[in-house]
């Protein structure tokens, strides 16, 4: 059985928040999660959401520059 702790090293790979949901929902649906595991999931989602938001803002600024 895969645990949340085993997923943590791969959190960089989980990436985009949509992918976060695709991976996390099966865990939430089928495995009783401890408080530690829920907090770990929240941390991974927060980390990756912030990372993608920053990339999106940079991309938007690049499109707004006069060409």
UniProtKB/Swiss-Prot annotation:
GO cellular component terms given for this protein: host cell cytoplasmic vesicle membrane; membrane
Region (Important for viral replication in intestinal cells): 13-18
Location relative to the cell: Host cytoplasmic vesicle membrane
UniProt keyword terms in alphabetical order: Host cytoplasmic vesicle, Host membrane, Membrane, Transmembrane, Transmembrane helix
Keyword Transmembrane helix: yes
Protein topology in the membrane: Single-pass membrane protein
Coarse class of the protein's main subcellular location: host cell
Residue ranges crossing the lipid bilayer per the database entry: 22-38
Signal peptide: none
Protein purpose: Facilitates virus release from intestinal cells in vitro, possibly through the host autophagic pathway.
Protein name per UniProt: ORF2p protein
Organism whose genome encodes this protein: Coxsackievirus B3 (strain Nancy)
Lineage, top ranks: Viruses, Riboviria, Orthornavirae, Pisuviricota, Pisoniviricetes
